[in-house]
């Protein structure tokens, strides 16, 4: 085992450690620190009754529970782990830092201790798919891959089993990046557009958080940037190591791009890697995801392996996922559509005919005006639900091409009603897609729960 890892766990023995939030991802961490001799407190807004067996399990581990609305009061522990979605600048955390506490996160500690090469992906859209493609490419090349961050499972509990020749592939959100003080060996930024402004407060803070992925890189690091996105292209001057671009729209002098004849090409070598039509998962956005992933692994994974993976990898659940075909109607789950740009670049770019779209959800305080014209062009029936329904309707009706009834707009009070309305109005040959253009937090704990509920309802149709 790496000496840094041994020294770290020796240092936490007897220390008081708090975990703020008892989600499924924190449970292995809590168990690990308790086993290493830390004095652990688990804090959560939920009651013991709501936590159920989890509360019993933690108590049996000797973990102190602080529950209820005041779960962040009296934060006096030596080390405090915040969950990725918890605001870094919360007054309670700021006060704890002022009193000498170390406020950190699972990913921060993992980056400090990880003995192997780290690939990390961030961006507004395409993070999970790009991260998954990188992991698939490296596995196919014979690497032992540890997948984590916002995808997979917590990696810190595995730290003692990770070998120097392994690779870690992680997806990082702006919430995770905002406080990180170490950068990956290979950093990928897929794109940037307004998102999470309910948490960050301004687009500038959101951009700065994302840019932190490359802030601490060295001369032998690699950064992969989207040349087609003005914001990510603007990161170029901050790159300290190797800089690679990817582009779907124009050639790159150094990077990976889609040539006008349909070939994905590496520059400056001119290597023809594969044709875009060979990629199994559909959509222009997935071509971009492959461009980014190929740039990340170039020099480690051969073109032959890249082609093999592209032809066989079926993608990630909740991303334009075909649920079933019923009476000639195709139902797709694109619950990952958590922002207008995701829905525009995903669902609204995939189908040749106008579709039935279920949209709406939690309000992240981001503008919907770009969504309006895309809905008018690609949607024949728009079914709206959730807190953002009025804003989306207003954006659609304000679009230049909108005419009354084109698209038709209906409102639903629940997912059950939305699916029922779609089923009632769909005809043979239609596509029905859930792609909300919003987060799920007003009705569901996460986009996976929302997508799974949609799939259950669609499977129950007859």
Regions found by a protein language model. Name each.
Residues 39-44, 147, 169, 245, ...:
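Short beta-strand "acidic-cap" motif of Rossmann-like dinucleotide-binding folds
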Residues 1-105, 109, 394:
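N-terminal leader/targeting and accessory segments in enzymes
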Residues 72-77, 84-227, 231-240, 257, ...:
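Phosphate-binding loop of NTP-binding sites
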Residues 4-16, 26-36, 144, 276-380:
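Nucleotide phosphate-binding/pyrophosphate-handling subdomain across enzymes
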Residues 33, 80, 121, 150, ...:
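Residue-level signal for inorganic ion chemistry
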Residues 55-56, 371-429:
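C-terminal helical cap/extension that packs against the catalytic core
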Residues 39-46, 223-227, 356-359, 378-387:
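Short internal beta-strands
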Residues 41-45, 66-69, 104-108, 240-259, ...:
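Beta-strand->loop->alpha-helix junctions that form or flank phosphate-binding loops
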